[in-house]
UniProtKB/Swiss-Prot annotation:
Function: One of the minor capsid proteins that constitute a network internal to the major capsid proteins and outside the lipid membrane. The minor capsid proteins glue and stabilize the capsomers.
Expression induction or repression: Expressed in the late phase of the viral replicative cycle.
Name assigned to this protein: Minor capsid protein P4
Protein's cellular compartments: Virion
GO cellular component, one term: viral capsid
Keyword tags: Capsid protein, Late protein, Virion
First-listed, main subcellular location of the protein, grouped into a coarse class: virion
Complex formation: Interacts with the major capsid protein.
Domain of life of the native organism: Viruses
């Protein structure tokens, strides 16, 4: 069942209990976020698209990331509307609330658009939705959300995009990928 963790720490009974707690946390957070959108932004296109597409959240087993020494923290299945979020990092350690909240906002933003074959998942339209969701979650719901250097390097986030997020370092000091340089 947990063979995907072969390269990481071994998983025991208490770990699966922690994963179950993580799933309950994800369900609670997403429910709170969507309820907030429906109440305060009922006519907004992002709300309409997300409510139409989102169906559930599940845990994502460990998957190696697209670049060296990374893991896939989440994904949005456009066919089913299911968000899958990794409960553990690449070392097999349980992710904290700030990290999970970042993934929630990131993946919910994917649910606001239609992705066509061959098109980038991280389009400008998606980035705008993600920035909007980060601000709503941090400013209006009081969520603690991490913004690691990778979010600056890969997606071009700036302090202005989420002033109340928890930045792991000054965004100006984060390396830029060739795509953003």
């Amino acid at each position: 069942m947990f063979s995907a963790f072969r390269d990481t720490a071994s998983i025991g009974f208490s770990d699966t209990h922690q994963d179950e707690k993580t799933l309950r946390f994800l369900k609670k957070q997403i429910s709170q976020f969507i309820k907030h959108l429906k109440e305060y932004y009922p006519n907004n296109e992002l709300t309409k698209k997300l409510v139409m597409k989102y169906s559930d959240v599940q845990l994502l087993p460990y998957t190696k990331g697209a670049t060296k020494d990374t893991y896939t923290s989440g994904l949005f299945d456009h066919t089913t509307g299911v968000i899958k979020i990794a409960p553990r990092d690449g070392l097999g350690n349980v992710r904290d609330e700030q990290s999970l909240n970042k993934s929630i906002c990131h993946e919910l933003a994917h649910g606001t658009r239609v992705k066509y074959p061959g098109e980038s998942s991280h389009s400008d339209e998606w980035k705008d939705a993600w920035k909007t969701f980060l601000k709503i979650a941090a400013d209006e719901l009081g969520w603690k959300i991490e913004v690691p250097c990778s979010s600056v390097s890969f997606y071009g986030l700036t302090k202005d995009d989420c002033e109340n997020c928890v930045w792991d370092q000054d965004p100006e000091t984060c390396p830029k990928t060739a795509k953003l340089a």
